[in-house]
């Protein structure tokens, strides 16, 4: 896929919920960071990328921290990166959003 092609990219990290879900089948830090980096590359100006990371399972915080490290390193002249969370509850999902600024 070429760069500047996509308006919205969404990631929902963790494992498939439900009583029969295999909690070993889940997203992993290394592949998630690679996928998010690819998503950022294909965002067109004005596009948005979101990542919802769940921190209540093994490896969840590490995965969110790795994504935060990646988006924190984006050029602020080209991107705005934010993190939203509920601060009065434990292990709440983190919503990370990246907006690629419009070109002038």
What are the roles of these predicted feature ranges?
Residues 1-7:
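S-adenosyl-L-methionine
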Residues 7, 47, 79-82:
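Residue-level recognition of the N-termini of beta-strands and the immediately preceding loop/turn
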Residues 7-35:
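Mobile active-site "lid"/loop adjacent to the S-adenosyl-L-methionine
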Residues 15-16, 54-58:
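Short "lid" loop at the C-terminus of a central beta-strand within the Rossmann-like core
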Residues 34, 38, 66-69:
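Alpha-helical scaffolding segments of alpha/beta enzyme cores, especially the outer helices
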Residues 35, 41-53:
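Conserved beta-strand signature within the Rossmann-like core of class I S-adenosyl-L-methionine
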Residues 57-104:
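Class I S-adenosyl-L-methionine
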């Amino acid at each position: 896929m070429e760069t500047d092609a996509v308006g919205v990219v969404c990631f929902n990290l963790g494992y498939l919920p439900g009583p029969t879900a295999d909690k070993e089948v889940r997203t992993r830090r290394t592949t998630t960071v690679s996928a998010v980096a690819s998503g950022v590359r294909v965002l067109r100006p004005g596009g948005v990328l979101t990542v919802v990371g769940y921190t209540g399972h093994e490896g969840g915080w590490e995965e969110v921290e790795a994504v935060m490290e990646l988006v924190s390193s984006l050029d602020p002249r080209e991107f705005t990166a934010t993190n939203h969370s509920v601060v009065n509850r434990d292990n709440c999902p983190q919503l990370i959003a990246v907006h690629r600024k419009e070109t002038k």
